[in-house]
């Protein structure tokens, strides 16, 4: 169980770094999804499954829709940083 929590922590940090290091939102979303899934998995491992489920549903139900809308408005897959 300790290795699983450590793995989720590493996935969360990698996801956050992936969001911070990508100038294009097309590729930053992969890190964002990885960080949210790892964070919800971390909450599940702590025993607060209802909170993890609610955060997962709210995030993927609302925040990802707003993100897709903003990506559609940006429409520049390879920006020059």
Curated annotation (Swiss-Prot):
Name the keywords, alphabetized.
Electron transport, Membrane, Mitochondrion, NAD, Respiratory chain, Translocase, Transmembrane, Transmembrane helix, Transport, Ubiquinone
Pfam families, alphabetized: Oxidored_q3 (PF00499)
| A GO CC term attached to the entry | mitochondrial membrane
Q: What subcellular compartments does it reside in?
A: Mitochondrion membrane
Q: What is its EC number?
A: 7.1.1.2
Q: Which GO terms describe its molecular function?
A: NADH dehydrogenase (ubiquinone) activity
Superkingdom, natural source: Eukaryota
InterPro entries for the chain: ComplexI_Subunit6, NADH_UbQ/plastoQ_OxRdtase_su6, Nuo/plastoQ_OxRdtase_6_NuoJ
Q: Gene3D superfamilies under this entry?
A: NADH-ubiquinone/plastoquinone oxidoreductase chain 6, subunit NuoJ
What membrane topology is given?
Multi-pass membrane protein
User: What is the annotated role of this protein in its UniProt record?
Assistant: Core subunit of the mitochondrial membrane respiratory chain NADH dehydrogenase (Complex I) that is believed to belong to the minimal assembly required for catalysis. Complex I functions in the transfer of electrons from NADH to the respiratory chain. The immediate electron acceptor for the enzyme is believed to be ubiquinone.
Q: Which family does it belong to?
A: Belongs to the complex I subunit 6 family.
Name of the protein described by the UniProt record: NADH-ubiquinone oxidoreductase chain 6
Lineage here is: Eukaryota, Metazoa, Chordata, Craniata, Vertebrata
């Amino acid at each position: 169980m300790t290795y699983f929590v450590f793995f989720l922590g590493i996935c969360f940090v990698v996801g956050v770094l992936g969001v911070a290091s990508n100038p294009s939102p097309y590729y930053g979303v992969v890190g964002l999804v990885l960080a949210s899934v790892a964070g919800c998995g971390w909450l599940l491992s702590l025993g607060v499954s209802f909170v993890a489920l609610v955060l997962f549903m709210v995030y993927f139900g609302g925040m990802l829709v707003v993100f897709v809308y903003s990506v559609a408005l940006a429409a520049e897959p390879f920006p020059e940083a």
